[in-house]
């Protein structure tokens, strides 16, 4: 019965031997899922730190409640179910349903994401934070 009590996810992405961005998220069971989606939104889809922080995301419920808690019946593992942010486009919803997923929706599907982008070309840093907390992306 032991379970982790802290699963902080500070991350640094490197490019050409230099830090490209530093980022992290709160959110228990969904932290790694949300960080990967954030990272891919930046490196694959060209979003800014702020755009990627606020982008809609999708969570699985395969390992729900790994940190413990009291909502055991509500948050037990549900294979084949996905939790989507309300802002996920209709065409994505349609594709996921066609693949056989059961979808549920919430206004907020991620903990606060905070990030700093290191712009080595212009010798500056760019911060971004999701709108899910009272957080700020600050670098110096």
Enumerate the predicted regions with their spans.
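Proteins synthesized as precursors that undergo proteolytic processing into mature forms
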Residues: 1-107
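In a subset of proteins, long, contiguous C-terminal domains/tails are tracked
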Residues: 90-140
């Amino acid at each position: 019965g032991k379970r982790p009590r802290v699963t902080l996810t500070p991350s640094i992405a490197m490019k050409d031997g230099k830090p490209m961005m530093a980022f992290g998220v709160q959110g228990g069971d969904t932290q790694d899922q949300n960080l990967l989606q954030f990272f891919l939104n930046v490196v694959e889809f060209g979003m800014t730190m702020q755009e990627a922080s606020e982008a809609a995301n999708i969570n699985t419920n395969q390992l729900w409640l790994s940190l413990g808690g009291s909502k055991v019946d509500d948050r037990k593992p549900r294979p084949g179910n996905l939790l989507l942010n309300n802002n996920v486009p209709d065409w994505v919803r349609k594709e996921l349903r066609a693949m056989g997923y059961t979808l549920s929706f919430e206004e907020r599907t991620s903990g606060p994401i905070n990030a700093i982008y290191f712009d080595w070309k212009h010798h500056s840093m760019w911060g971004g934070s999701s709108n899910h907390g009272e957080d700020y992306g600050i670098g110096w």
